[in-house]
UniProtKB/Swiss-Prot annotation:
Substrate binds at residues 27, 129, 329. The active site is at 80 (nucleophile). It comes from Escherichia coli (strain SMS-3-5 / SECEC). The lineage of its organism: Bacteria, Pseudomonadati, Pseudomonadota, Gammaproteobacteria, Enterobacterales. This is tRNA pseudouridine synthase D. Belongs to the pseudouridine synthase TruD family.
Length: 349
């Protein structure tokens, strides 16, 4: 298995170095649900600004304030503790009057707005996130500048970030031990983390191998192509390759890579043979995913940060802004810009 730090770069290994997250204010995340609260219903959506608090801790504190069980407070995704983040929490309060949430007090947190909503906010039910990052102590400004320009055109690999695999790769190591021993794992959280790490590592490996090709974004026979921004996909045939390539070049279509698991992976012929060869040595992880009935899926191979802009405060400090769809990693963008000091693994997804 390729170590995360050794995964293939789309733009070559960065020449410069820099510091990511010198302080929480250098990593700002604003959640984008993609919809507005209904204004009625038995749930309350609460938009929180937080600094120095993890999502679960704030959710539990909100439940205590509302005098409801912790399981009645949900959220679309975990946000990093060591960052400034805006996100929505959802509390189910059937039959109760609208509480005064301006009275909710928690160090490092501020209620920005709240409103009634008809449905529970479920994990993953967000459109994306807007990021504002500050990179400090940057060396080789010219290289970073050129990479930002190139990323606007060619994107970055859509790798799962190091945080998916746990500190020191602990989640992936857990998955490997589970695969090798076949010992039942009772802890639901561990099961989820380990299976996710296993599938993500296999995806990363397939993408890393594809990026070694001279023409990375070239459609091959049997590729599974996805409409940009959509989850559905279809298989490319030899007769269609030229037209499909034009649509890929226009970013209308995205080439996908496998999230291996049980069932068919989605690619056929040449593309399927390539993907299978890329992870052929990882028989234990593949068998684990099949045994635990984790269904195979597809994910775009490349990621195009939207609304990408940047501003150099001085020759060694740059502020970068961009928007990413749900499930994508800001650290996968930063990885193509600089060799960072510090460990990505502690950054929440």
């Amino acid at each position: 298995m390729i170590e995360f730090d050794n995964l293939t770069y789309l733009h070559g290994k960065p020449q410069g170095t820099g510091l990511l997250k010198a302080n929480p204010e250098d990593f700002v995340v604003v959640e984008d649900l993609g919809f507005e609260p209904d204004g009625e219903g038995e749930h309350i959506l609460v938009r929180i600004l937080k600094n120095g608090c993890n999502t679960r801790f704030v959710a539990d504190a909100l439940a205590k304030f509302l005098k409801i069980h912790a399981r009645e407070v949900s959220f679309a995704g975990q946000k990093d503790k060591h960052a400034v983040t805006e996100q929505w929490l959802c509390a189910r309060v059937p039959g109760k009057e609208m509480p005064d949430l301006s009275a909710f007090q928690l160090e490092g947190c501020q209620v920005l707005e709240y409103a009634r909503h008809k449905r529970k906010l479920r994990l993953g039910a967000l459109k994306g996130n807007a990021f504002t990052l500050v990179l400090r102590e940057v060396s080789n400004r010219d290289d970073v500048e050129q990479r930002l320009i190139d990323i606007c055109v060619k994107g970055v690999p859509n790798y799962f970030g190091a945080q998916r695999f746990g500190i020191g790769g602990s989640n992936l190591q857990g998955a490997l031990r589970w695969a090798q021993t076949n010992t039942p794992v009772r802890d639901r959280n561990k099961r989820s983390f380990w299976l996710s790490a296993a599938r993500s590592a296999l995806f990363n490996q397939i993408v890393a191998e594809r990026l070694k090709k001279a023409d990375v974004n070239q459609v091959v026979d049997g590729d599974a192509l996805q409409l940009a921004g959509r989850g559905s996909w279809f298989v490319a045939t030899t007769e269609e390759v030229a037209e499909l390539q034009r649509r890929v070049n226009d970013k209308e279509l995205m080439i996908t890579a496998a999230l291996p698991g049980s069932g068919e992976w989605g690619t056929q012929r040449e593309a399927l043979a390539f993907e299978q060869a890329a992870v052929a040595a990882e028989t234990e992880l593949q068998a684990l995913l099949v045994r635990e009935k984790v269904e195979a899926a597809r994910r775009a191979m490349l990621l195009y940060p939207q609304q990408l802009s940047w501003n150099w405060w001085d020759d060694v400090t740059v502020e970068i802004r961009f928007w990413l769809p749900a499930g994508s990693f800001a650290t996968s963008v930063v990885r193509e810009l600089i060799n960072t000091t510090g460990d990505y693994a502690h950054i929440a997804e």
